[in-house]
Amino acid sequence: MSSEAETQQPPQPAADAESPSSPAAAATAGDKKVIATKVLGTVKWFNVRNGYGFINRNDTKEDVFVHQTAIKKNNPRKYLRSVGDGETVEFDVVEGEKGAEAANVTGPGGVPVQGSKYAADRNRYRRYPRRRAPPRDYQENYQSDPEAEPREKREGAESAPEGEMQQQQRRPTYPGRRRYPPYFVRRRYGRRPPYTNSQRGEMTEGGEGEENQGGPDQGNKPMRQNYYRGFRPSRGPSRPRPVRDGEEDKENQSESGQNQEPRQRRYRRNFNYRRRRPQTTKPQDGKDSKAADASADKSAAPEAEQGGAD
């Protein structure tokens, strides 16, 4: 009995069984059984948005399901993994849950697939890291008046050693590229810069130049501009106020005095004073009432005389 047991040998494994070191076993994805390898087929259709499609095998004319995760070598210019409709691909056939599936999908001979024409391309200029641009220096690139350069910058440039000056001169310059300061870019469309003091002085009478020239302190202040869209400052010639009898002499005296003084001291009249009632109306009302009483007495006297005569 013991000799017969020793002579009996264990059954040999099947020839088609796969060893763990075989390439077919290595090609299995998630312990899936490999049906065929290096099979050529034509893509029937592939949905880039959903990420799946079907491949028609050239040998058996069978449709094989393919998922975007099964694509091994994708087109490097494409952003997503995909295969194009009608493209010839090479793949392995494995057994899936619902039927045959494709795995290790590549182009013929192991080249990358072409990909679908509906798949998004990668950005062309992002392949290599960007070069860091030099720091923006608005005073160098946009300087209309050389005398307006700040003193601190000129003093710093004089005190800087020669080595730093050479490094600043070696900075690359980009021809044809003009950089503007940030405040200029914001007011670029549909807005004009505020008037300077020289422009305000040259304007004629009745305009903004004469109105904005107030006292000696107001001439040096910069013009304040409203940056809200659709704002229109209402600046027009001031309307003349009705002149009374008592104020004619005063205005004549004030005009003669103003002609002697320079025009720069004239200031814009505050419009809030128009709403206030003038205080000089009371004595005038008294004079008018007295004149009315006197005229009434005069008219009553002739009537009385006529009645006596009758």
Swiss-Prot record:
- Please indicate which residues carry the site annotation Important for C5-methylcytosine-recognition: 45
Biased composition, class Basic residues, residue ranges: 124-133, 176-191, 265-279
Could you say what a knockout of this gene produces?
Embryonic lethality caused by early gastrulation arrest: maternal mutant embryos fail to undergo normal cleavage and the maternal-to-zygotic transition. Early embryos show severe developmental arrest at the shield stage in maternal ybx1 knockout embryos, leading to lethality at 8 hours post-fertilization (hpf).
Q: Does this entry carry the keyword Secreted?
A: yes
- For the region Disordered, what residue ranges are annotated? 1-31, 102-310
What is this protein's function per UniProt? DNA- and RNA-binding protein involved in various processes, such as translational repression, RNA stabilization, mRNA splicing and transcription regulation. Binds preferentially to the 5'-[CU]CUGCG-3' RNA motif and specifically recognizes mRNA transcripts modified by C5-methylcytosine (m5C). Promotes mRNA stabilization: acts by binding to m5C-containing mRNAs and recruiting pabpc1a, thereby preventing mRNA decay. Plays a role in the maternal-to-zygotic transition in early embryo by binding to m5C-containing maternal mRNAs and preventing their degradation.
According to UniProt, the name of this protein is: Y-box-binding protein 1
